[in-house]
Amino acid sequence: MHFAFLGTSGSIPTAVRDTTSIVVVVPDGALLIDCGGSPVQKLRRAGVDPQALVSVVITHIYPDHSYGLPALVRNLAVLGRQAPLTIYCRPEHVEPLRSLLSLFSTLERPGMFALTIRAIDLAEDVHAFDLGPLSVRTSPNEHSAMPNFAVRVDVARRRNVVYSSDTRPCDAVVALARGADTLVHDATYSERDRNRPAGHAHSTAAEAGEVAARAAVGGGPGVPATAAGRTAPARRTPHPRS
């Protein structure tokens, strides 16, 4: 298993970083988690064949995590894809995603590959689905008024990565990330923002490191700097609620 960052920015892309998304690759295929703009281009830049995608996870439906989905589906269809594709999301996001794809006439087209949008279980640390040797588990996290969830990908309990995008520090993510090799965690704010209003449901880079340390990411909590180094880069955005 290996994974690649397709984007690490907040809700506003920078000149060199797009919105948050990662791809996890195994011999059986690839799993895309969140879908920003130009996903096919970014997959190719990462050395991943877009046709290798088997599943897509959309953690929540703020635009920076989902707006690239119609482009992805349309591009795959134009490329001649025949294999089915499954999109996983929260139950309340199934219909909004169907509406988004329908708006661009990409939900169903004559001769198009089979596309399924499937709801995940909302319980903490629950098995969601498998992809070859990958076992995917999820837990709700805490992101203001927008329901969201974190994702853990394990390869036969040998190697793993945990991804939690927009969230404040929370126990559910600590539990999901327990003993993980790598934690990719929201790090929107700098330390000077630690006393931000409670409604700004993101984390500082230091808080992301504290979550990693509490979860003993990378082998133990004794070296917080190492744990912090396993989180996503700090990213500033003028729209902290997205």
Positions of PLM-derived features:
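Binuclear metal-dependent hydrolase catalytic cores
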Residues: 1-163, 168, 173-175, 234-242
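Cap/insert and terminal regions of metallo-dependent hydrolase folds
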Residues: 168-242
